[in-house]
Amino acid sequence: ILIRHGETDWNRELRFQGQVDVPLNATGHEQARRLAQRLAQEAVVAHHLVSSDLVRTRQTAQPVLGALLPQLHIDNLTDPDLREQNFGLVDGMRVQDIKDQHPDAWARWLCFAPDSGMPGGETTQQFHARVIGALQRLAQQHAGQTLVVVTHGGVLDMVWRTAQGLGLSGPRQSDIPNAALNRVRLRPGAIDILHWADTRHLQGLPAQPVYDQTRLQGAGGAPPADR
């Protein structure tokens, strides 16, 4: 079970969050609470819960762990390899500021080249190798078990691309809402998508910022609200 963290203020402020430690906002906490409630109501069976070590994932994981503990003795582990992509010098910056202060880097970013990244940050290839390697490692360590993994939008994008056999170039092609349920099966050398972007438990909450990479290349560019 893969979960993207709940909403933060930086999602709303349209910043590259990257690996900056940003906490959940009030909506994000409510998303996490509803997610935990749904897992408890569905009596989801899980053996381990793993999150990235950033605060927004740990805060999302906390109520989820509480919902699962009455059923099973599971532990809460953190793994820094599940962090969001490192955007280097632009971590924490608004898109307009990146365009103004790093125009060449921004132009390269809009090409979505796998071997390119923001100054001082990871390339998409490096990011993909890190996060898919981490998930395959966890799957091998806990073979035959169900894991709940709380991570980031960019990580889930890499999972989707891998499962669908897509390359790393080009804009994102999947919806990755905050605190949605995504169910996958990891096999040696492959990932199967079972269910994706299930947000039934979030009905009635404010509309989420949408990370539409296809609009980034348009006039003005719509900023990435998730990463």
Where are the model-predicted features located?
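Generic beta-sheet signal
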Residues: 137-138, 145-151
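Loop-to-helix element that buttresses phosphate recognition and phosphoryl-transfer chemistry
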Residues: 7-64, 114-132
